[in-house]
């Protein structure tokens, strides 16, 4: 008995180290996910890339997610989340290296595609791995911290134009090789994560007679209406936020707002920096006061307002940055826990897989469409007005996201709600549909 108690105490302390390793690994993935944005102008000037080519470099990483969304759960169940995280990190290093070699253009696209295989798997694998280390009462806090620390990677790559300025002075390639080094650090963290998981992970207490859930194609689309509303919000919000912020924002700030590369990178980074600290706070507020659907509606409303401020006013860039920062902190903090309240536990894997699949398609399509629109309008440093059509595209897309949030709010305040508007204790007691 004492030895068992000591082992439990040791595992309780070790799980925080495991969380730190997972955060390092996923942060390296987030860093390389966004690595094209800061060098977009350099790729324009030094290699003559078009807006469509830049859009492809970011859009292509979403393509593997379509397939991985359907098989990730099966791979994790078959081989274990820690092993999948390790192999995903290794694939990510390969993709980052090919991207850094970067010539010809097709090799760079191939590198981004290979990195997309890693990016699509590692986030879910690490999160599933953490669920095996943390109890049911602790996984929510662990997931919030994990998500916040993951965004350190996004913040770091945006601010790299300032703290790694000498790299950017040397051209487009050194920042990509630096990103490869970051990916290698993530692989080291994933390796240690895998080793600790193999030798020290707490024993899982499975419920007798509870069969493993499989993807049921016959009932794939049989979800409650609230699920389809929140799926629409997942997809449309991501299709607006990530293409704009990771592909086009820095270049737009340079050409349309007159910022230097360093200033544009810092302005863009504050959205991710705020999310690092604010995401757990909004999650705690939702648990404390409820009104999750209302919070999602408010957070999504800030998205179209941001593009109105950018395109139709002369307000300081920091106004739109603060608005988008609040939105990006609030919506992810609430939408994932809200999804788990709407969907029955036995079907949660299928539900999240379907969300991930359609979300990947939406982000890839939005990236390519925005780039094509900007190219057609002749957007660039000599024609800042050419970016207006891209802003209108994102504005209209964000309005459709807002409509999904409003529909979800209306349903959840009626008799068919799932407890999203209630405080956590009541929500947990609500019957899953």
Predicted regions, residues:
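Extracytoplasmic gate region of multi-pass secondary transporters
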Residues: 36-37, 225-272, 276, 366-367
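Residue-level signature of mid-helix packing/kink "hotspots" within the transmembrane helices
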Residues: 34, 62-70, 154-155, 272-280, ...
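C-terminal transmembrane helical hairpin of 12-TM major facilitator-type secondary transporters
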Residues: 292-338
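Cytoplasmic helix-loop-helix junction between adjacent transmembrane helices
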Residues: 111-150
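Conserved MFS/SLC helix-loop-helix module at the cytosolic interface between two early adjacent transmembrane helices
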Residues: 67-106
